[in-house]
A protein has these predicted regions:
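Signature of long, low-cysteine stretches enriched in small and polar/charged residues
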Residues: 106-161
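Sec-dependent bacterial lipoprotein signal peptides
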Residues: 1-20
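Short, flexible beta-strand-to-coil junctions
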Residues: 84-85, 98-103, 137-141, 160-161, ...
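N-terminal targeting sequences that direct proteins away from the cytosol to non-cytosolic compartments
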Residues: 9, 22-80, 163, 168-198
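A short acidic-to-branched-hydrophobic micro-motif
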Residues: 76-108
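Residues that flank catalytic or metal-binding motifs in active/ligand-binding sites
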Residues: 56, 92, 153-154, 189
Length: 198
């Protein structure tokens, strides 16, 4: 009889572990057709990692993720992805500011250093998150584009805990038409972002 009770106790514990999610198995959320998940990873010398996962269009080249000037002490430095024609599409500089307790995104001191200045700044809500969106001009003579097509970027700043991150998305517009980007696509990309530390 005692053996039966012990077996029941063991099975009960196993069932509780299974239903409480205490297993090594992780469900992978598959992106919609035409989309893919990529990871930007910043690593410190001590082995700590920051990962920004994001869902992006499939025509972007998953194997092209590049690093520029990454700081091995602060989880910062530019990581970006190109499309399959080698044109920069989007990226992040990792952690760009740290908020004090009680501060919000509006209080963040962000040293953006845009070479051509900022065309506009506004705060927008997408889902449950608030973003600061800086609209900037990148240049007026993009490689491989007609001379009247300029390159712009929307730089989105957002908070996770007390950390401020950025995520930028490039797009093209005819001369000064800075509002020519695909609004739903950019919102979808932003909504998919997740941050993890390991």
């Amino acid at each position: 009889m005692k053996t039966m009770h012990k077996l029941l106790l063991v099975f009960s514990c196993l069932a509780l572990l299974a239903f409480s999610g205490c297993t090594d198995k992780k469900e992978t959320v598959q992106p919609e057709p035409g989309w893919q998940v990529i990871d930007f990873v910043w690593s410190k010398e001590n082995g700590d990692k920051l990962t920004l996962s994001v869902t992006v269009p499939e025509e972007w080249d998953k194997d092209s993720v590049r690093k520029e000037g990454c700081d091995s002490e602060t989880f910062s430095g530019e990581l970006y992805i190109d499309d399959k024609n080698g044109l920069k599409q989007a990226g992040s500089h990792g952690i760009v500011a740290v908020l004090d307790d009680g501060q919000s995104l509006q209080d963040a001191e962000i040293d953006a250093c845009y070479p051509f200045g900022c065309l506009s700044t506004e705060y927008i809500a997408i889902g449950d998150n608030t973003y600061r969106r800086d609209n900037i001009q990148i240049d007026s003579k993009s490689a491989g584009l007609p001379s009247n097509v300029w390159t712009f970027a929307n730089v989105y700043y957002f908070c996770v805990d007390n950390y401020v991150f950025d995520f930028f998305i490039y797009y093209s517009g005819v001369e000064i038409d800075a509002d020519s980007y695909d609004h739903p696509q950019q919102e979808k990309i932003l909504s998919s972002i997740s941050i993890s530390f390991s």
